[in-house]
Amino acid sequence: MPIDLAIDFGTSKTVLLSGNKIILEQPTVATVDSETWEPVAFGDKARDMIGRLPEHLESVFPIQRGMIADYDVAEQMLTEYFTNSLGKHLIKPRVIIAMPSGATSIQRRSLENAAEIAGGRKVQVIDSAVAAALGMGIDFTRPGGKMVIDIGAGVTDIAMLSGGGIVQCDSAPIGSLDFDDAIIKYVRKEFNVLIGQLTAEELKKQIGSVVPRKEEVIIKAKGRNLFSGLPQLFDITSTDVYLAMKDTAQNLFSAINSVIERTPPDIVADVMCDKIYVTGGGALVNGVAELLGKNLNTDVLVRSDAEYSVVKGAQAALKQPDLIKNIDYQLRNIQDLISNLE
């Protein structure tokens, strides 16, 4: 029996969905041999090795800002994930894979090629924001503007949708990983302590917020003292983490405002009378929905399963081929226009 496979090949996480069931969810990271560049581990195993590797091995993140940064590793990772989740089938799975709207035709084709070599057939690429809209059950086939924001780990996709198509779209190179980087820089500057990416991520999840918390929270964190080089245990507050994150949040909202400013007034009016739909793992960062609603003076909807909206929408898109063909045509025209302006 033919298999349909929807993929969210994200900067920090890869999710495979088949038959409305998540069949694989793994970090988008590999451990490779430094000399041969041959992968020795993928996913959770590779993530657990970050910061703990011997000299002959290194961590590689094949997707950067939503685009393929290392084609060979990306291809081998998809092959590994396909095999682990599906086993061996006589009929290759039909594949649809999400990608930021800012991707060029060359970048889109590169991703299609990687998925085909990994074992997919009839590979399609869908815009992440469109997939997110479908995954949230938004009907944008009728007149009336809908605004969808997909905040991923490395990139944020912003789209104005109406009448079954894209009115305005953009991809901003800002995501939830930038909050982690901001926390690392803040701790280094204010505490003279170096912390790793995983520690920063935990601080973001536990006490992070892009708005001041009503009650101060203090937790202990571990790092390495920059002067002595020794391990150090230190107290960090929710206010510290807020101060670390707030500038990145402002950069994110500036990118969103830029799309709104380029959108026809009637579509903007529709959005303001309805709500803004926010999805992606970054949507779950504390205070994002609150601050966005306050800045734009409108309601914001974030679902509890926001990090899976894109892959669910990608699967739903397989049942609407005409809609996807129309949107793909629009995106290619938008990219051609941008290229001509450059």
Task: Give residue spans per PLM region.
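Nucleotide/phosphate-binding catalytic cleft detector across ATP-hydrolyzing
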Residues: 1-151, 160-276, 283-306, 310, ...
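Positively charged, low-complexity, intrinsically disordered RNA-binding extensions
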Residues: 156-157
